């Protein structure tokens, strides 16, 4: 057999307790349908992901105008297709119900599209391929939403990755991919079985790491970020949904 694709040469940690998801970990390439149907979350580190290559595209993100403050920068696009040949779907508002998002639910949020140059990068294609592999969707027919988000932490403004609080996104799968953490504290990713229960997962995702979440069974949240020095800090992530 030939060498496996680079994005599958990784250690995948199956869902477990808070701060220790899966203990020593289990090597996993392609989950079966039955295993996927039963999963809550999976944590993975992508090997040799060139996160620096996407930095210029995060530096060029516009301010999210739908929340108070200027700490969140954001783009959003919808796609079908393979990672190397994504088909951009018609531009649409991003709308969530008020039951899902109590902060911005019911608002037609019109975010700028992801830049064409980003789609051509191997690192970005690896992120998309990993999401497809572990969600087991058919990318030719299933719509993928891709949010590109930068949170800025400054001395004058706290960075809130999830100002809506503990929530679900209203999809089957959510993939949170950490691309960059620079000069910040906080930004822990939490997963919950219910909003009024302690988290079952609590971890700071490091660059190259991502967590796949069953959005039907779990809620998620990310804590506020603060700068660790005099200069602004940033947290860059891709959030993929299907």
Across the structure, where does each feature detected by a protein language model lie?
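Signature of the catalytic double-stranded beta-helix
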Residues: 85-145
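Structured loops at beta-to-helix junctions and adjacent beta-edge loops in soluble globular domains
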Residues: 76-82, 147-149, 178, 214, ...
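Catalytic core of Fe(II)/2-oxoglutarate
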Residues: 188-242
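Short glycine-rich, low-complexity/disordered patches
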Residues: 64-76, 135-149
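Residues that flank catalytic or metal-binding motifs in active/ligand-binding sites
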Residues: 75, 142, 171, 185, ...
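Catalytic core of non-heme Fe(II) oxygenases with the double-stranded beta-helix
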Residues: 138-206
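Conserved hydrophobic/aromatic beta-strand scaffold that supports enzyme active sites
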Residues: 78, 165, 174-176, 210-212, ...
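N-terminal auxiliary "cap/dimerization" subdomain that precedes the catalytic jelly-roll/cupin core
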Residues: 1-101
């Amino acid at each position: 057999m030939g060498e496996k694709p680079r994005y599958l040469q990784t250690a995948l940690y199956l869902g477990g307790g808070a701060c220790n998801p899966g203990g020593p970990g289990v090597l996993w390439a392609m989950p079966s349908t039955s295993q996927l149907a039963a999963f809550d979350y999976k944590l993975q580190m992508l090997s040799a992901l060139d996160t620096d290559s996407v930095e210029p595209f995060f530096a060029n993100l516009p301010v999210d105008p739908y929340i108070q403050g200027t700490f969140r920068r954001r783009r959003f696009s919808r796609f079908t297709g393979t990672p190397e040949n994504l088909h951009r779907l018609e531009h649409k508002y991003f709308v969530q119900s008020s039951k899902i998002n109590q902060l911005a639910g019911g608002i037609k949020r019109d975010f700028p599209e992801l830049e064409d140059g980003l789609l051509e990068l191997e690192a970005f294609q690896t992120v998309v391929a990993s999401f497809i592999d572990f969600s087991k969707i058919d990318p030719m027919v299933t719509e993928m939403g891709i949010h590109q988000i930068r949170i800025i932490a400054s001395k004058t403004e706290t960075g809130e990755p999830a100002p809506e609080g503990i929530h679900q996104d209203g999809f089957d799968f959510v993939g949170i991919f950490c691309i960059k953490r620079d000069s910040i504290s906080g930004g822990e990713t939490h997963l919950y079985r219910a909003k009024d229960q302690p988290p079952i997962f609590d971890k700071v995702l490091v660059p190259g790491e991502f967590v796949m979440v069953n959005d039907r069974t779990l809620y998620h949240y990310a804590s506020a970020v603060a700068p660790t020095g005099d200069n602004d800090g940033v947290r860059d992530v891709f959030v993929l949904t299907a």
